[in-house]
């Protein structure tokens, strides 16, 4: 209905951990080496917004970009989890757009947080699909 806003399927995540250069094609596209270890970074809570919310451009931004990602939504606390058991902790999956301001990210001492943590830089959803409903390794994105 008109005037109704669809929010993110996970409203207030305790943590939003992202993996940088997680697609070989994207690493090559940016001219960077394919990492041998995951490059982890955080997005802040105010990055999360609904799938149809406006993305707010930061002041002086001129190189906005986005990447389609799959979000793994954890369903229970995970600490010292064996690799073979890791998927048992996943409650479900959602679509996420990892929004970036590339000049802030790359030209300011390579600080990913500066380019990836602005308000609304993590549109999420619209749906959360339960872990038993799909095989995340068999998705076209």
Language model feature labels by segment:
Residues 1-14:
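Anion-binding (especially nucleotide phosphate/pyrophosphate-binding) glycine-rich loop
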């Amino acid at each position: 209905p008109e005037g109704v806003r669809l929010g993110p399927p996970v409203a207030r995540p305790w943590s939003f951990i992202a993996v940088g250069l997680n697609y070989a094609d994207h690493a090559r596209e940016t001219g960077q080496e394919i990492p041998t270890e995951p490059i982890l970074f955080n997005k802040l809570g105010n990055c999360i917004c609904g799938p149809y919310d406006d993305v707010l451009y930061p002041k002086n931004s001129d190189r906005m970009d986005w990447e389609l990602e799959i979000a793994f939504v954890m369903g229970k606390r995970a600490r010292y989890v064996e690799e073979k058991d890791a998927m048992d902790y996943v409650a479900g999956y959602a679509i996420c757009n990892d929004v970036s301001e590339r000049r802030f990210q790359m030209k300011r001492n390579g600080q990913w947080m500066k380019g990836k943590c602005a308000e609304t830089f993590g549109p999420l959803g619209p749906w959360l699909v339960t872990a038993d409903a799909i095989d995340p390794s068999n998705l076209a994105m």
